[in-house]
Amino acid sequence: GKSRTINNVLKSMGDGLAIDSDELRLLHPDIARISQLDPLRMDVLSNGPVGEWTKALITHIREQRFNVVIENTFARSEIMAAEAKNFERAGYQCSFIALAVPELVSRLGIVNRYRAAVQGGNIPRWTSEVSHTNAYAGIKTTVQELLSLGTTPEVTIVSRFGDQNILVDSPDQAADAITHIRED
């Protein structure tokens, strides 16, 4: 779902770069040791430099005027709003796309991603129950806040397969649109 959505957005922009903090996490100097010692907490234990790396990369890309997709969990609207303002001040046009996936499909995706990495000899990434629940539940609030703060005039809610999308331009529409796509 996420990869397909990001690729579709990049194509519609005429190409660009995607920033995914989970990919940057794999560059952590202790990632191999962390993954061996506690693979189910790898995301938490490797957080240290990842936020700073992500911020530095975003700043560099903005300064170099690249088209960019910033993958995010939609967990913290205030950070997203501030970053959008930074891009707009630099002359960018910003938009927000939220992926709405049924909860069980989302959880199964975590398990499948982890198993595929282990079977492929790669570094597995697990998302904790708390992290998943917070991000999954928080997306509705974040979309509502982005709209009510005036960060963006609209947010596109997209289904996992990209076959459905709903353009939301009012905070009151956000929860219903996300629920509709998740349940359809």
Question: PLM features: what roles do these ranges have?
Answer:
Residues 1-11:
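Glycine-rich phosphate-binding P-loop
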Residues 6, 58, 84, 140-147:
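Short amphipathic alpha-helical segments and helix-helix/interface helices
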Residues 24-25, 75-76, 100-105, 162-164:
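Conserved nucleotide-binding/hydrolysis micro-motifs of P-loop NTPases
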Residues 18, 96, 155-157:
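Conserved beta-strand scaffold positions in the cores of enzyme catalytic domains, especially
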Residues 89-111:
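Conserved phosphate-donor/acceptor-positioning beta-strand/loop module used by diverse small-molecule
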Residues 108-184:
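Conserved GTP-binding G-domain of TRAFAC-class P-loop NTPases and closely related GTPase folds
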Residues 14-90, 127:
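Conserved nucleotide-sensing/catalytic segment adjacent to the nucleotide-binding pocket
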Residues 8-9, 83-86, 110:
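"Short basic amphipathic alpha-helical interaction patches in structured regions
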